[in-house]
Swiss-Prot record:
Cross-referenced InterPro entries: B-gal_small/dom_5 (IPR004199), Bact_Beta-galactosidase (IPR050347), Gal_mutarotase_sf_dom (IPR011013), GH-type_carb-bd (IPR014718)
Originating organism: Leuconostoc lactis
Reaction it catalyzes: Hydrolysis of terminal non-reducing beta-D-galactose residues in beta-D-galactosides
SMART domains (alphabetical): Bgal_small_N (SM01038)
Assigned protein family: Belongs to the bacterial beta-galactosidase small subunit family.
Protein's UniProt keywords contain Hydrolase: yes
Name the record gives this protein: Beta-galactosidase small subunit
GO cellular component, one term: beta-galactosidase complex
Molecular function GO labels: beta-galactosidase activity; carbohydrate binding
Length: 319
């Protein structure tokens, strides 16, 4: 069908929902719990479905204060939290029940909409568990708004971080962002200046023992640029980009070639695997890194993330 700038082509699949426009194609999976494919101008941007994130690689200070042991539940939650409910809304009208096969048979190949939202509700593996909701809202121009809500729960340890992780198929050539200069953390903001910055490649701070690094606080926008894909038939090395921008408030982000788990597993830099992916982490909350000493002193109280408090953040994806 012919695409226009004011309509989405909606494809009701057996176990997924497709949204198409003139130069984009998004696939939302009911089984995998989120956005499974994000194609813009024939370039795929996702290697894995984005997932809620509760862990950042621990630091020497974390180990010294025992924080990594106290909050170990969040390490498992980062890996194993499951999506247990999905809500679909098309042009502000709820679609119930969820149109999986054979319920999708009533739809044609010519369904259109101006706005589609999918809310994925995740249950953490913590004891007690809590709920995280990730809501994707797509408009006809291809912009994706992502709103993430963490429901505060008493009797849980403090969080290392809370955010959403995007793993991209190939390594980025670099990224540009508007925010604070250099690496910054909630307790490491002094001396940073606000501006627009470019970072080549995906640098990892060369600590003797790999640990948390590369955070950028108070970010208004970050644009990731790649020049390669996993498509062996794609010989075009022209750079292409995707932008993540704030909505109501700035966010924090890191853009690395490794996940927090990969950094956590390595005890020396040479144990890290070859860089093959881009791991963009968008954070709504980040624990401080401390530094008073590395043999027992905790991060100062204002830089903790209490588990009993709600956390909300949102951002847009556009091209």
């Amino acid at each position: 069908m012919a695409y226009t700038n004011n309509q989405l082509h909606v494809i009701y699949g057996d176990g997924s929902l497709g949204l198409q426009g003139a130069n984009f194609h998004y696939l939302f999976s009911y089984e995998r719990g989120g956005l499974e494919s994000l194609v813009v101008n024939d370039k795929e941007w996702l290697y894995r479905t984005p997932t809620p994130m509760f862990w950042r690689a621990t630091t020497d200070n974390d180990h010294g204060s025992g924080f990594s042991v106290k909050s170990a539940q969040w390490y498992a939650a980062d890996k194993f939290s499951t999506c247990q409910d999905i809500e679909l809304t098309v042009d502000d009208q709820p679609v119930t029940p969820l149109p999986i096969a054979p319920l999708n048979n009533k739809y044609t190949d010519h369904e259109i909409a101006t706005k589609v939202s999918l809310a994925y509700h995740f249950v953490t593996t913590t004891v007690p568990s809590t709920i995280v909701t990730v809501t994707y809202t797509v408009t006809a121009d291809g912009q994706i708004n992502i709103a993430t809500h963490y429901s505060g729960q008493s009797d849980l340890p403090e969080l290392p971080a809370f955010g959403l992780r995007f793993i991209m198929p190939t390594t980025a050539t670099g990224f540009d962002y508007t925010g604070l200069s250099g690496e910054t953390y909630p307790d490491r903001l002094a001396g940073a200046t606000h501006g627009q910055f470019h970072v080549d490649s995906l640098p990892v701070t060369p600590y003797l023992v790999p640990q948390e690094c590369g955070m950028h606080m108070q970010t208004e926008q970050v644009t990731v640029t790649r020049s390669t894909t996993q498509n062996n038939a794609d010989h075009d090395n022209t750079p292409f980009s995707l932008t993540f921008s704030q909505t109501d408030a700035p966010f924090a982000f890191s853009c690395l070639p490794y996940t927090a788990a990969e950094l956590e597993n390595a005890t020396h830099m040479e144990e890290l695997p070859l860089a093959r992916r881009t791991v963009l982490s968008i954070y709504g909350a980040v624990r401080g890194v401390g530094g008073i000493d590395s043999w027992g002193t905790d991060v100062e109280a204002p830089y903790h993330i209490l588990a009993n408090q709600d956390i909300d953040f949102s951002f847009n994806i556009h091209f």
